[in-house]
């Protein structure tokens, strides 16, 4: 068992009730016990990822030509990278400053210079460019059209472009028209307006990158819990006694979540990571929008459970078996919100805890410490 596990493992010893195991909630003040060290943002440690301060300096340099406009977009605009209802430097989900590297990286989408129309004259040359190279060409400021057989794109007026698109939709009809939205930096507001416009035109088929990104999770959630969406909110994280991250690395993939995890840690929440590898960003993290965390860092992981790749299901079965045998299952909740409990309990009763732990790549003691 990794060293971070001692705090949680000791707190939930044999026979401890849920109430006894619950961490004490604290006021969200600065807490030295969570500090990583006295290096602002871990400068010089060589293990910090992502390095927000370096990214901020790089992005500021990229926008040196029009800093005033870039500042207006940040201070008055919405976030292109999340759905927290961001208005300027604040959002509707959590107090404090809202600023993440995802939003900064997408800033260039909103502040790009107009591209040179001459660069659109050769479609074959455009095909040879990468996505990054195409974005570097700049912002498409005017409608461009390429007809079949033409070498490249040529500029047309807004009236001609809108009339041609409208005529195509009118001739096809709403039943034979689909709207697909996917682009780097499309905001919630754009999705909302596009959906309203599609309905006004009688178009029922609206799809977006959200479905492509989350299709696997929606299928799995529907099969597992009967609902295709998550059953908790970010607000729930702030009030949770224990947050379990299974096969997830939010420090790299969902950095906005780390601010909520930091606030939860200040309130006494424990964090367990179930993953073969303990990501550096889950050992220690520096939240750039929080003075305390930016200066001293925040210890995130309290317990690391190094399951074998593919051993997640066996691990969860083993944990559930321990909870059942120790009478730590909230049967009132289970009875009100689940189906098939009796069959699951009977199946677990016939399984050997040591075999389950072995399949998960763990010792029985590690499973018991987590449970």
Model-derived segments and spans:
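Cofactor-pocket helix-loop regions in the catalytic cores of large enzyme subunits
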Residues: 20-50, 138-371
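Metallocofactor- and cofactor-centric catalytic cores in central/energy metabolism, strongly enriched
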Residues: 78-171, 285, 363, 369-370
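Intrinsically disordered, low-structural-confidence terminal and linker regions
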Residues: 1-85
């Amino acid at each position: 068992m990794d060293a971070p596990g001692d705090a949680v493992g000791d707190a939930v010893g044999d026979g401890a009730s849920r109430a006894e195991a619950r961490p004490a909630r604290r006021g969200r003040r600065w807490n030295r016990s969570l500090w990583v060290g006295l290096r602002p943002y871990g400068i010089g440690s060589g293990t910090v990822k992502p390095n927000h301060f370096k990214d901020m300096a790089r992005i500021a340099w990229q926008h040196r030509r029009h800093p005033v406009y870039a500042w207006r977009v940040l201070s008055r605009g919405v976030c292109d990278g999340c759905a927290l209802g961001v208005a300027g430097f604040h959002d509707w989900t959590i107090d404090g400053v809202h600023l993440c590297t995802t939003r900064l990286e997408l800033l260039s989408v909103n502040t790009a210079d107009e591209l040179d129309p001459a660069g659109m004259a050769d479609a074959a040359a455009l095909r040879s460019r990468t996505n990054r190279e195409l974005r570097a060409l700049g912002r498409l400021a005017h409608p461009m059209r390429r007809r079949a057989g033409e070498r490249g794109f040529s500029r047309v007026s807004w009236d001609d472009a809108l009339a041609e698109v409208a005529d195509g939709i009118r001739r096809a009809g709403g039943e034979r028209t689909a709207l697909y939205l996917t682009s780097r930096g499309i905001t919630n507001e754009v999705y909302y307006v596009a959906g309203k416009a599609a309905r006004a035109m009688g178009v029922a088929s609206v799809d977006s990158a959200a479905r492509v990104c989350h299709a696997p999770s929606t299928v799995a959630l529907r099969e597992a819990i009967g609902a295709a969406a998550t059953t908790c909110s970010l607000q729930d994280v702030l009030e949770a006694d224990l947050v379990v991250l299974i096969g997830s690395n939010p420090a790299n993939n969902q950095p906005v979540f780390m601010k909520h995890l930091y606030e939860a840690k200040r309130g006494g929440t424990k964090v367990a990571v179930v993953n073969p590898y303990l990501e550096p960003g889950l050992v220690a993290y520096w939240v750039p929008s929080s003075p305390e965390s930016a200066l001293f860092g925040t210890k995130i992981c309290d317990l690391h459970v190094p399951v074998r790749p593919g051993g997640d299901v066996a691990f969860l079965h083993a944990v559930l078996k321990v909870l059942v045998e120790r009478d730590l299952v909230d049967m009132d909740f289970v009875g009100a919100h689940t189906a098939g409990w009796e069959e699951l309990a009977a199946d677990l009763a016939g399984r050997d805890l040591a075999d389950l732990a072995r399949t998960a790549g763990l010792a029985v003691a590690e499973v018991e410490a987590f449970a």
